[in-house]
Amino acid sequence: MSILTRIFGSRNERVLRKLKKQVVKINKMEPAFEALSDDELKAKTQEFRDRLSGGETLQQILPEAFATVREASKRVLGMRHFDVQLIGGMVLTNRCIAEMRTGEGKTLTATLPCYLIALEGKGVHVVTVNDYLARRDAETNRPLFEFLGMSVGVNIPGLSPEEKRAAYAADITYATNSELGFDYLRDNLAHSKEERFQRTLGYALVDEVDSILIDEARTPLIISGQAENSSELYIAVNKLIPSLIKQEKEDTEEYQGEGDFTLDLKSKQAHLTERGQEKVEDWLITQGLMPEGDSLYSPSRIVLLHHVMAALRAHTLFEKDVDYIVKDGEIVIVDEHTGRTMAGRRWSDGLHQAIEAKEGVDVKSENQTVASISYQNYFRLYERLAGMTGTADTEAFEFQQIYGLETVVIPTNRPMIRDDRTDVMFENEQYKFNAIIEDIKDCVERQQPVLVGTISVEKSEELSKALDKAGIKHNVLNAKFHQQEAEIVAEAGFPSAVTIATNMAGRGTDIILGGNWKAQAAKLENPTQEQIEALKAEWEKNHEIVMKAGGLHIIGTERHESRRIDNQLRGRSGRQGDPGSSRFYLSLEDGLMRIYLNEGKLNLMRKAFTVAGEAMESKMLAKVIASAQAKVEAFHFDGRKNLLEYDDVANDQRHAIYEQRNHLLDNDDISETINAIRHDVFNGVIDQYIPPQSLEEQWDIKGLEERLSQEFGMELPISNWLEEDNNLHEESLCERIVEIAEKEYKEKEALVGEDAMRHFEKGVMLQTLDELWKEHLASMDYLRQGIHLRGYAQKDPKQEYKKESFRMFTEMLDSLKHQVITTLTRVRVRTQEEMEEAERARQEMAARINQNNLPVDENSQTTQNSETEDYSDRRIGRNEPCPCGSGKKYKHCHGSRVARQ
């Protein structure tokens, strides 16, 4: 600690000192607010809104608003906000993260900033990690907010459009992070203003902010449509992978390996060796999937390479019951941070299909991205962002760097007395499991409840089998049993209860020492007062037993890659000043040790074990683990930052497209825009055939006439114009062509009416924009996947990505203009008379077909011989619509046949 810190305190201490002065103000107001009637207290909401309209700021009314919420909470919920919760609420009104320990009442704390900021009328979004927590928190706080005249909405999957709009229209909306992100994307795929759900993104309060903004940061939200089906190719390539042999190290000048592929466990990537490439190519040729003499890395075989690499990763880097589970014939992803299943989510780049083929379930079609955004960029759209969690301080630097959020550690209401014991290391996993079981036995005998944290479904099941063998009764909470989550967590605090939980499954629900009597009462149908009193008495007895036994004991079966996840596990114990203890059991076979410690350190540690099954505790061990975790955290931070830098490029483009799209939706008349881009398009076309500042000999008039005819359906005698007028230069020529195009367009508009044409313009523009944006996203995906190869040419991949994506984006915008004008210029408008005439012609032709039994042309649905004879006698203009009703011009339809005859 520096001398300045000793004198002035840390930044966190200085912030807390300042906020405590506000707490004193709020506490002084309490007697006055207690004296208010319910109606007077309710009237405060309108008073605050009026004061804000009159020019006061949120900070000026904060003390009174917080005093109002505290008093209303006492009357409605029977809960009074502690001083530390008031501090937490003040932190959350700014762009800050409040780190509040488990059990300190984050749900109640959130009511303070939500009420205050909702007074502005812009809407408040309270973001949770799952549907259960969104519903639970909304229902818990709804009576309080409604008492104060605030409406509450819940936005979860499965709502109807009307329910969703009502949820977003509420003053305070509880929602999951994924649903908010997807609704944003859906709004930007809407075809009318009425289809949109979200209003201005004003204030988001993110619960478990570390889980959403850090753990989920690398997960993009994608709305997709089906691409072409290549499931058979995945099934075929799947048969190849088991024959490939792993090579421990990559080939170098000194080392030439014997294997077919190498693995990078840190980044979860697989690479074929030269030998592996030859083996794969031989197999593909044998199977008839690739012609002889071709290479897997040739541009024409890029799809095959994509399938091979996806299958290789599926077999070597993704484990069943660790990364995913198979449920009801489907592959369901398991969240590596929470241990929860993520139904509905699929891995991209063909990985999900490759795993489906590996597990022998139905292989679904690949998807094409229609719209996407990362959580990082979605939450940065909010005017105000704040978050709460029990563990943020370890990631404070990242929150500041990426989101501009300062982390403030809120003191606990009561001192924390949990006993965090030194880690214990064993030589192998079996010795470690033996020690864990002995620790659990000791706790069960003393009637102390135990929560055992594992890092995967597989490990939780291994430990469960070992406990069954030892005759220890226990509950398992992992991705396979998540439906019973609330029930298992409610029982985890009973005396002698043993609960195995994958990572942080059950996070968001407190483990109450002695069990949860309210959860037991909820199981009873219409419980009597006597039954409730009996449950309370039973709980008090159990609570006393558990307190004497030392509170909840936490056992970690191995260290996670992140210190934050370890702290979350420990944080389940010692809530609100309760006793508790924690200990991590480790082995040299743990993933963290194998992947992130070099062989030299591992060998040194192996030599330290001289007796089989002995445990090792030392300060050096703690340093080694801290060093490994710091490396991993830095690696993942760099990965997230790198991803954001790439996504920022796409984000700028996304912002521009969505802004343009919203402008289209909000305006019923875009004729000025159409006129402007018509000029641009014709100028661009003419410049290709008549270059600016060029000599007349360089002009390609014939080419220009053909282009205007083919693309825009305009038959213009430009050669004649030039012969008739020697002074006609490129600018005046362009003006004349645009004038004619506008004149023809106005004639069409006169036929259908102004409103119909405006509606049509808007529809064409939206449809073309959506189609081109979808194609652009696919191109960006391909560019992103291969851009790292530019590094071999001594070029910076990020800079190259920026340049290439900008070029692609400008090309897309040019294509948008061109396609819109082409469509609008070529569109045919039929008058009522033409439609009636075409119908008569069809009926006549049908009668002749019936009489003569002549063959029918599939395209025009009319006979060839009779129609040419029929129409040759009539005087029809070459550019008029063919009366047969085919939709083509007469010269391109039956007129051409007349000419041939």
UniProtKB/Swiss-Prot annotation:
Its EC number is 7.4.2.8. Its cofactor is Zn(2+). It is found in: Cell inner membrane; Cytoplasm. This is Protein translocase subunit SecA. Keywords: ATP-binding, Cell inner membrane, Cell membrane, Cytoplasm, Membrane, Metal-binding, Nucleotide-binding, Protein transport, Translocase, Translocation, Transport, Zinc. Monomer and homodimer. Part of the essential Sec protein translocation apparatus which comprises SecA, SecYEG and auxiliary proteins SecDF-YajC and YidC. It is a peripheral membrane protein. ATP binds at Q85, G103, E104, G105, K106, T107, D510.
